[in-house]
Curated annotation (Swiss-Prot):
Record keywords, A-Z: Calmodulin-binding, Carboxypeptidase, Cell membrane, Cytoplasm, Disulfide bond, Glycoprotein, Hydrolase, Membrane, Metal-binding, Metalloprotease, Phosphoprotein, Protease, Repeat, Secreted, Signal, Transmembrane, Transmembrane helix, Zinc
Disulfide cysteine pairs (residue numbers): 163-171, 365-383, 551-563, 763-769, 963-981, 1149-1161
Chain sites annotated for binding chloride 2: 797, 1096, 1100
Residues at which Zn(2+) 2 binds: 994, 998, 1022
Chain residue ranges for the region called Disordered: 1293-1314
Glycosylation sites: 44, 60, 80, 117, 166, 324, 515, 683, 701, 720, 766, 948, 1197
One CC-aspect GO term: cytoplasm
Keyword Metal-binding attributed: yes
Cofactor note (record): Binds 2 Zn(2+) ions per subunit. Binds 3 chloride ions per subunit.
Lineage, opening ranks: Eukaryota, Metazoa, Chordata, Craniata, Vertebrata
Coiled-coil positions: none
Organism whose genome encodes this protein: Mesocricetus auratus
Protein name as annotated: Angiotensin-converting enzyme
Subcellular location: Cell membrane; Cytoplasm
Length: 1314
């Protein structure tokens, strides 16, 4: 549009400062007015038609001179906005106004009485034009004020800039920066900032100036006989029913606009969601791709009906083909000349400003075409950008110039369009052809032309976003101004009425609160420039009437929207006749000659868009769209972190490219890291550790690089949930956020702690050394000798815990720093975030409380059994149980002491270990059976690569390895392994199923992006294998494997089985709960390094009812003796998994059609159960875990009810048994500790005895006993006293009364994610 672009507000100066500067300029005394050259004054003419002819001829030659000089001055100012040029422009304007005044008054004086009787209609039009003085009616001082107001308003609009928050060095002009942002950004907040800032920085200072301008303009035109300025503007259309005609046209087109609005609103809703788009309300004004929401074609990519069809926006092709600005204008010129119309004269190419200057000049960027009225100098001023939209604008502006060229020989008053809409329509008529796919193909911007319905709908929708979207805006701007000029809209209601019209006609609303301090109409160029706007509404009707007529002249056959009049000289000749007529005849005559009708008519437009009208109606009906905006008062909320977060990227296409690149590069790096990690874990050497640290560093650099890039995205309004979820996950950079030196230190600490744990052993004095796996583990599982168990228990902690303690505080410090840098309160907060639940700690506490009664009954029953075996010296029936007597190094599961606690010892044995050994089972056989279970469910078998590369038993070649069982994903979609020092026993049979559960999970989600290759939450991954193990452990299944002689089935058999399961599952609950309770409190600082061990034992006492068998001090670090603590593996996952595995088991049993008690269910060979499990695993981490939970169980919550149901028979039996024996539930004598005096007995495998911490031959020990008897007794007393004192301090510590917080889960296996 010759005046339909825009510019943006001042950067450093505030709106108020601009306002005061403008007012100050207006208050300065006017400079002396320049005088009009006497030779340009009118002479004497007779007051008749002949005199009028002579008057008009004389006027023409003088007017050309004066207008040329005025236009030159205006051009100089608009292309270099300096104070000097402003002064010269105002002087030239005053001369023109003086010229208009003297000639206008002369015309009134001589011809007002007779002009209506002139026989020459052209002459009558000339005189009527000359006699209208406009601002020249004003006295000189007020005329100068009027000119100054116009210049100041234009200066404010054209030089204003918007600066980023707190960054005055980074400021944006309207062209090109703000226009580009509104066109290309999809960031709600950034768009809002650009929109709000521009409207504030321009509108606020303009308002008082505009009030004064309105008053002076009305004063001027009233003296020409008009009621106000609006009446004068409407007079250009020479129709008494003009306003009614416009209203009729608008209502004729309104249904099409309403359907387009509803369709676009739905598309925006998909992008921005319910928060910012109300499907029954107006659309926020900043989201439509344009500062004024006047055309919406810049959001075509968001609303395109058929995205897979060729892209009709050829901007990228223009750039790729090296189009420059001059070429764009040459292409437009060639279109005109192909129709036999005039080329641009040399002055056009020499003098036009086709690009924004780069020399620092302030210019008026709004595109405009200029006639210098010397019949040879015609120019365009445009800050052109290489875009398809600007290509249309170029044709539009050149249409104005072509009009100038065609009517240049008419007298000056007739050198204008037949009406203002004609002038705006001409270039747009050609643009209708230029934008067709056929024409874009002809000029090399489209590879091929698709002639199918979907491509047509895409094209017409794109055109509708430009043409139909504009109609209500083109209509309302002057509806508002006419109300301002008439006084119907006073200054106190400028903004209210502006938004009333914009909501009424456009169905848009301001995105932020606006009031009467704002002047949002002023943010549109045509308001401060005083350019009438209804011309554009008229032109949008006319251009389709012209297009239809010219296409007919060109012989076009087919749909109107496919017509291209390029190279049609017949169409050119018809158009030329219209242009050459200028203003010489009534526009109705010119229109009739062109189209066959003398009225404005929307039928051609409706015909053009008919296919897309029908398509929009169908789409809206199908989607149940509301046409209109019944909730018209709705307004969107402000974004969070506004305006600080406006620089974040919200382009989902860019985000998709980022995610693809991240995924592709991560797969390679994570595979390399996993290989190096595997090599280290299966052969602990210095060289392997160096390689691992190098790979770790590469992964950290990758994580840091892409995490930093991910943080540049604002995903809050992404509609693609997958992209949103991946980027949020990538934004958490974990340890990679640390500075390089600290990262290196952190990695070294972790490696040192894990290495210390993994290679540790304890040795007898004879040099025989025992590793944790299998030696110490076997002793703890099978020995029933109090002192032997004590020595193993204590020695392991002395060797491992004390070595790790010096490293742990720094590990905690750096872990917290990592958490802080990633936006978390501390390390525990970071770990808990994996569960995506604000109520996680409360939920876990609730689960623990539900299960505590069962644990207390189990604890009391087991304590009674241990009392029978070890006696009252070592077991207090009202106190905690010594931690080394429960068959496991950490007392986490108690199934290894099943022989001591079996409810019915005479019932058949449930432990399959003996049968496995007798039948010659091997570690490989164990895993083959596990693989068979999965495949029997219809799940995936492991590959040959798994069998070739896994480490399924401890190597016999002397290598140091990390024996802790773990499953590995190598991130290439085919390499999955297990590392386990498997022993042939039933416990490891269960663990093998657990590990194979991880492998199955890996295989099911292998095709997801790497970010989603995790469990729905960490507990899910731990639970899958354990679910199958619940079936594997049943007597029925063990019998099917020939590992038990019968399926069992009697009551005693059932209770024995459930007891064995409870020793694994129920005994584990408090242990899995407390480990991260302790670590979270270490991370949050409530447990300090001075009381690590004291608080550890406080929690173990509180939750497990256990005590250390020997005194512990702060020099000890017993948490460090558990793999997951030095290995930095969160543990709450195991608590969670132990809860949810029973929920899964219950759901899978239901799917398998199982009837009867839950503990007897075996899902082996159930394809239905397998499908349910597979569907859940395939989700990986792609959705929040409650959705995965709902998929498998039918509801989204964690619940202990399935576990309680499973153990219900045992619970009833335990309650009855404990009541029968009068057992105490709990440990009221919590201060009690076992007798620490050791019996001096021989230790197996050495033949030596322990005496005062030394290992001696039995004979030496006996001699020593007699010699040091007295000293030994004294030592015993002292030891007992010290023990009592230590535990008194410990038990009265504040931590016992501290409310605990936390989560945990299932069967422990370390996951190796990067």
């Amino acid at each position: 549009m010759g005046a339909a672009s825009g510019q943006r507000g001042q950067g450093p100066p505030s709106p108020l400062l601009l306002l005061w500067l403008s007012l100050l300029l207006l208050l300065l005394p006017p400079s002396p007015a320049p005088a009009l050259d006497p030779g340009l004054q009118p002479g004497n003419f007779s007051a008749d038609e002949i005199g009028a002819h002579l008057f008009a001829e004389s006027y023409n030659s003088s007017a050309e001179q004066v207008i040329f000089q005025s236009t030159v001055a205006s051009w100089a100012y608009d292309t270099n906005m300096t104070e000097e040029n402003a002064r010269l422009q105002e002087e030239a304007e005053l001369i023109w106004q003086e010229f208009a005044e003297v000639w206008g008054k002369k015309a009134k004086e001589l011809f007002d009485a007779i002009r209506q009787n002139f026989t020459d209609s052209k002459l009558r039009r000339v005189i009527e034009t000359i006699r209208t003085l406009g601002p020249a009616n004003l006295p000189l001082a007020r005329r100068q004020q009027y000119n100054s107001l116009q210049n100041n308003m234009n200066r404010i609009y054209s030089t204003s800039k918007v600066c980023l928050p707190n960054k005055t060095a980074t400021c944006w002009s309207l062209e090109p920066e703000l226009t580009n942002i509104l066109a290309s950004s999809r960031s709600y907040a950034k768009l809002l900032f650009a929109w709000e800032s521009w409207h504030d920085v321009v509108g606020i200072p303009l308002k008082p100036l505009y009030q004064d301008f309105t008053a002076l303009s009305n004063e001027a035109y009233k003296q020409d006989g008009f009621s106000d300025t609006g009446a004068y503007w409407r007079s250009a259309y020479d129709s008494p029913s003009f306003e009614e005609t416009l209203e009729h046209l608008y209502h004729q087109l309104e249904p099409l606009y309403l359907n387009l609005h509803a369709y676009v609103r739905r598309a925006l809703h998909r992008r921005y969601g319910d928060k910012y788009i109300n499907l029954r309300g107006p659309i926020p004004a900043h989201l439509l791709g344009d500062m004024w929401a006047q055309s919406w074609d810049n959001i075509y990519d968001m609303v395109v009906p058929f995205p897979n069809k060729p892209n009709l926006d050829v901007t990228n092709t223009m750039v790729q083909k090296g189009w420059n600005v001059t070429h764009m204008f040459r292409v437009a010129e060639e279109f005109f000349t192909s129709m036999g119309l005039s080329p641009m004269p040399p002055e056009f190419w020499a003098e036009s400003m086709l690009e924004k200057p780069t020399d620092g000049r302030e210019v008026v960027c709004h595109a405009s075409a200029w006639d210098f009225f010397n019949r040879k100098d015609f120019r365009i001023k445009q800050c052109t950008r290489i875009t398809m939209e600007q290509l249309s604008t170029v044709h539009h502006e050149m249409g104005h110039v072509q009009y100038y060229l065609q009517y240049k020989d008419l007298t000056v008053p007739l050198r204008r369009g037949a009406n203002p809409g004609f002038h705006e329509a001409i270039g747009d008529v050609l643009a209708l052809s230029v934008s067709t796919p056929a024409h874009l193909h002809k000029i090399g911007l489209l590879d091929r032309v698709a002639n199918d319905l979907e491509s047509d709908i895409n094209y017409l929708l794109k055109m509708a976003l430009e043409k139909i979207a504009f109609l209500p805006f083109g209509y309302l701007v002057d509806q508002w101004r006419w109300g301002v000029f008439s006084g119907h809209t006073p200054p106190s209601r400028y903004n209210f009425d502006w938004w009333y019209f914009r909501t009424k006609y456009q169905g848009i609303c301001p995105p932020v609160v606006r009031n009467e301090t704002h002047f949002d109409a002023g943010a549109k160029f045509h308001i401060p420039s005083g350019t009438p706007y209804i011309r554009y509404f008229v032109s949008f009707i006319l251009q389709f009437q012209f297009h239809q007529a010219l296409c007919k002249e060109a012989g076009h056959q087919g749909p109107l929207h496919q017509c291209d009049i390029y190279q049609s000289t017949q169409a050119g000749a018809k158009l030329q006749r219209v242009l050459q007529a200028g203003y010489s005849r009534p526009w109705q005559e010119v229109l009739k000659e062109m189209v066959g009708s003398d009225t404005l008519d929307a039928q051609a437009l409706l015909e053009y868009f008919q296919p897309v009208i029908r398509w929009l109606q169908e789409q809206n009906q199908r989607n149940g769209e509301v046409l209109g905006w019944p909730e018209y008062q709705w307004r969107p909320p402000l974004p969070d972190n506004y305006p600080e977060g406006i620089d974040l990227v919200t382009d989902e296409t860019e985000a998709e490219r980022f995610v693809e690149e991240y995924d592709r590069t991560a797969r390679v790096l994570w595979n390399e890291y996993a290989e190096a990690n595997w090599q280290y874990n299966t052969n602990i050497t210095l060289e392997a550790s160096k390689i691992l640290l190098q790979k770790n560093k590469k992964v950290a650099n990758h994580t840091l690089k892409y995490g930093t890039l991910a943080k540049k995205f604002d995903v809050s309004n992404f509609q693609n949930y997958t992209i949103k979820r991946i980027i949020k996950k990538v934004q958490n950079m974990d340890r990679a956020v640390l500075p390089p030196k600290e990262l290196e230190e952190y990695n070294q600490i972790l490696m040192d702690m894990e290495t210390t744990y993994s290679i540790a052993n304890v040795c007898y004095l004879n040099g025989t050394c025992l590793h944790l796996e299998p030696d110490l583990t076997n002793v703890m599982a099978t020995s029933r000798k109090y002192e032997e168990l004590l020595w193993v228990w204590k020695s392991w902690r002395d060797k491992v815990g004390r070595a790790i303690l010096p490293l742990f505080p720094k590990y905690v410090e750096l872990s917290n720093k990592i958490a802080h840098l990633n936006g978390y309160a501390d390390g525990g907060d970071s770990w808990r975030s994996s569960y995506e639940s604000k109520s996680l700690e409360q939920d876990l506490e609730q689960l623990y409380q539900e299960l505590q009664p069962l644990y207390l009954n189990l604890h009391a029953y087991v304590r009674r059994s241990l009392h029978r075996h070890y006696g009252s010296q070592h077991i207090n029936l009202d106190g905690p149980i010594p931690a080394h007597l429960l068959g496991n190094m950490w007392a986490q599961t108690w199934s290894n002491i099943y022989d001591l606690v079996a409810p019915f010892p005479s019932a058949p044995n449930l432990d399959a270990t003996e049968a496995m050994i007798k039948q010659g089972w091997t570690p490989r056989r164990i895993f083959k059976e596990a693989d068979d279970f999965f495949t029997s469910l219809g799940l995936l078998p492991v590959s040959e690569e798994f069998w070739n590369k896994s480490m399924l038993e401890k190597p016999g070649d002397g290598r140091e390895v990390v024996c802790h069982a773990s499953a590995w994903d190598f991130y290439n979609g085919k390499d999955f392994r297990i590392k386990q020092c498997t022993s042939v026993n039933m416990e490891d049979l269960v663990i093998a199923h657990h590990e194979m559960g991880h492998i199955q999970y890996f295989m099911q989600y292998k095709d997801l992006p790497v970010t989603f290759r995790e469990g729905a939450n960490p507990g899910f991954h731990e639970a899958i294998g354990d679910v199958l193990a619940l079936s594997v452990s049943t007597p029925k299944h063990l019998h099917s494997l020939n590992l038990l002689s019968s399926e069992g089935g009697g009551y005693e058999h059932d209770i024995n089985f459930l007891m064995k399961m409870a020793l694994d599952k129920i005994a584990f609950i408090p242990f899995s709960y407390l480990i991260d309770q302790w670590r979270w409190r270490v991370f949050d600082g409530s447990i300090t390094k001075e009381n690590y061990n004291q608080e550890w034992w406080s929690l173990r006492l509180k939750y497990q009812g256990l005590c250390p068998p020997v005194p512990r001090s702060q020099d000890d670090f017993d948490p460090g003796s558990k793999f997951h603590v030095p290995a930095n593996v969160p543990y709450i996952r195991y608590f969670v998994s132990f809860i949810i595995q029973f929920q899964f088991h219950e759901a899978l049993c239901r799917a398998a059609g199982h009837t009867g008690p839950l503990h007897k269910c075996d899902i082996y060979q159930s394809k239905e159960a397998g499908k349910l499990l597979a569907d859940t695993m395939k989700m990986g981490y792609s959705k929040p875990w409650p959705e995965a939970m709902k998929l498998i169980t039918g509801q989204p919550n964690m619940s202990a009810s399935a576990m309680m149901n499973y153990f219900k028979p045992l619970t009833e039996w335990l309650v009855t048994e404990n009541r029968r024996h009068g057992e105490t539930l709990g440990w009221p004598e919590y201060n009690w500790t076992p007798n620490t005096a050791r019996s001096e007995g021989p230790f197996p495998e050495s033949g030596r005895v322990n005496f005062l911490g030394m290992y001696l031959e039995p004979q030496q020990a006996r001699v020593g006993q007699w010699v040091l008897l007295f000293l030994g007794v004294s030592l015993l007393v002292a030891t007992l006293g010290l023990t009592h004192r230590l535990f008194s301090i410990r038990q009265h510590g504040h931590s016992l009364h501290r409310p605990h917080r936390g989560p945990q889960f299932g069967s422990e296996v370390e996951l190796r994610h990067s």
